[in-house]
Amino acid sequence: MEEIQGYLQPERSQQHNFLYPLLFQESIYALAHDRGLNRSISFKNTGYEKKLSFQIVKRLITRIYQRIYFTTYSSNKSQIFGPNKSLYSKLLSEGFAFIVEIPFSLRFILERKKILKSQNLRSIHSIFPFLEDNFSHLNYVLDILIPYPPHLEILVQTLHYWVKDASSLHLLRFFLHEYCNFNIFITPKRSRSPFSKINQRFFFFLYNSYVCEYESIFLFLRNQSLHLRSTSFGALFERNIFYGKIECFVKVFAKDFKANLCLLKDADLSMHYFRYRGKSILASKGTLLLMSKWNYYFVNFWQCSFCLWFHTERIYISQLSSHSLDFMGYLSSIPLTPSTVRSQMLENSFLINNAIKKFDTIVPIIPIIGSLAKAKFCNVLGNPISKPVWADLSDSDIIERFGHIYRNFFHYYSGSSKKRSLYRIKYILRLSCARTLARKHKSTVRAFLQSLGSEFLEEFFTSEEQILSFTFPNASSTLRGVYKRRIWYFDIVCINELANYQ
């Protein structure tokens, strides 16, 4: 353990960066399963780390470098790991991912003081007040679908800047070429490969390192092009959800795109950049022509920097006044709200019509109904159905589960400007709960509710928890009036699973 801690010292790591010998440390695999460097990802401890020894790791790595073993193919055995592919690949890949994270963790530790100084409320809802204050002045949004590298060598070259150990990079090449389809790393939920299901740390590390590389290039080019420093904000949740905003965001690739310097460089332009669910979103108060130039710039950037044939169809230019932005489970837009003001001057009166921009957040009811249908609470049309898998639970547990789901929905979408759609969700969950209870007692829904009363389920779906929020009502205001307002909570640290629709 002391030897591993020695590799975490900045002075020693900067001198040689030799991470490959750590693969032969048995305790490194126990750390990979128990806690990790930052305890960011929790893995289920299945007890197979007890089966690991120095001889197993040495034998597996030796097999990787045996050319004759690669040429031997069997339909029942893996090329490298043999019949215990699921076990050995998980051991080595998680251990390798844990070790190769050391340079990044050192960077995180060195910059920890700067991160603590940032104003981070550690709440997803803290983002929306910022959007309300700033997005009302913006006009267009670039919705960019982040491309994935088609060639595996791009991933290796990305890590080459941080990991100087050639042996570790060679081992990474063997891992990637053994599972040659990179889609199993970037889409683990959709893949049926067992490797994609058991290598979450490896998947997150590859994806985050790739995204961190291209965003660091943007930040570097921005600081080189303008004297005005950008203001950054970061919140890191479980290492896979990252949000950042940059004011006056202008980046010019002066080396390869000198001709675009006069087109994009504008110190007075206010722009905001953030990344969410595999997308990069760039919002600006500029014109459509300027956003088209940014579209052209991004295409050339990906092609020249990462050798990616990036199509313009992967970038959507939307006007906030007429289109909604899918962000953090909300459909956000800035519609023009007409407002008429009557002015009286002596005997003359005037009617002044003004169009006011207002940040609007809407609950995406159709995708949420699709998520409820996928979770077997209703059909695709939104008609409630029973939940047979919960029929074996007690009545109180069934009601509490349905009520807990609805309360989570209500709390997360409390900032919506139109809450009428929440009653549709309440209707689906309430009737699904009644159907589940009636199925358990082998009765009809009507007979079950008549025996217990119509208010039996109402109290479980209307009782709200007292949670500190951004809205502090007056003593004279009623509870009903409070919930008509938009409320942003301090304790929302993750999106509801049913709200995080695919």
Curated annotation (Swiss-Prot):
Domain of life per record: Eukaryota
Pfam families: Intron_maturas2, MatK_N
Main location: plastid
Keyword entries, A-Z: Chloroplast, mRNA processing, Plastid, RNA-binding, tRNA processing
Cellular compartment(s): Plastid, Chloroplast
MF term (GO), any: RNA binding
A single BP term in Gene Ontology: RNA splicing
Gene Ontology terms: cellular component: chloroplast
Keyword Chloroplast: yes
InterPro entries: Domain_X, Maturase_MatK, Maturase_MatK_N
Family, similarity comment: Belongs to the intron maturase 2 family. MatK subfamily.
Functional note: Usually encoded in the trnK tRNA gene intron. Probably assists in splicing its own and other chloroplast group II introns.
PANTHER family in the record: MATURASE K
Official protein name in the record: Maturase K
Protein's organism: Ipomoea purpurea (Common morning glory)
